[in-house]
Amino acid sequence: MAFKIASSPHVTRNLHTSTVMQRVILCLLPGLVVQCAFFGWGTLIQVLLAIIVALSCEAAVMKLRNRSIKASLSDNSAMLTAILIGVAIPPLAPWWMIVMGTVFAIVIVKHLYGGLGHNLFNPAMAAYVLLLVSFPVQMTSWIAPSTVALNTPSVIDSLQLIFNVGAHGGMEQFRLGIDGISMATPLDTLKTDLSLGLTTTESMAKSIFDGGTGVGWFWVNLAYLAGGLVLLKLKAIRWHISTGVLAGLFVASSIGFLLSPDTQASPLFHLFSGATMLAAFFIATDPVTAATSPRGRLIFGALIGVLVYIIRTQGGYPDAFAFAVLLANLCAPFIDYYVRPRTYGHSAP
């Protein structure tokens, strides 16, 4: 009988890049469905448009580099980047914004540094920051959740609003006729109210806040949390970064809330508002741009959580995950250098 001789580690199952990406995309679907349920068809349209642009850019770059187009498209990394950009921007943002952001993510952030596995920054978050800094008004104008809006746009209405086609007078009248077609998120509303001298309790008495979190956003975050837990169960990601992000945000927001409950939101609000669960399980866990050792991943995640709280409360933008992730990406080599695991048989570095 012939025995196959193989060196360690003796892995019993191989997880290819395409398999990992497929699992991440599938686990994103619950959050995407709930997000569409609360914020309309615009989110799905943005995701589909981003996928088309991302795959086209990926194929074009591979053609220019004389690489295999089929192999590059089949790893599903471009599709995942497109979906993350699509769910991050407002549902009714103009079509050219999602096109610009996706092209920037794939061509500049990903392939300018050598392609998959070589990019320094998370492509989706780099694209989001580009759009947020360049077009702050459009990037902070979210459609009102379906549970509080007097009317919500249909599929046709969403297409016309995104692509700015049809009867322009009618579309403008439609925009003005919907109460809250463009509105601030709960994070932005709280930040604005606190700057005007209102207390947290007074601000959260508004209808946009649903029992201390935010209409729609609690369920969206809960759906992404469920998908993230499945992702952990499938071992597509490790628990260190997600735990670090949530723990860092929870501890920082708890300290702030205990010191000044009138001007600081509760930890529950921070955990289930904005892009918290999406970022903790699907964005910060990008293995290319994160720290590599288990202890380093915990520090990396905790750094993101603390930075999110600082920027949310002291910065100029209501949600801060994109900035926090990019800043942590910068710190990842530093963390890896000083948090190296001890090699067996050698002293600690």
Curated annotation (Swiss-Prot):
Modified residues (FMN phosphoryl threonine): T185
Residue intervals passing through the bilayer: 36-56, 77-99, 124-144, 212-232, 239-259, 265-285, 291-311, 315-335
Lipid bilayer topology: Multi-pass membrane protein
InterPro entries attached to this UniProt entry: NqrB/RnfD, RnfD_bac
Main localization category: membrane
UniProt entry keywords in alphabetical sequence: Cell inner membrane, Cell membrane, Electron transport, Flavoprotein, FMN, Membrane, Phosphoprotein, Translocase, Transmembrane, Transmembrane helix, Transport
GO cellular component: plasma membrane
EC number(s) given by UniProt: 7.-.-.-
Description of how the protein assembles with itself and partners: The complex is composed of six subunits: RnfA, RnfB, RnfC, RnfD, RnfE and RnfG.
Function: Part of a membrane-bound complex that couples electron transfer with translocation of ions across the membrane.
NCBIfam families membership: PRK00816.1, rnfD
Name under which the protein is recorded: Ion-translocating oxidoreductase complex subunit D
Gene name tied to this protein: rnfD
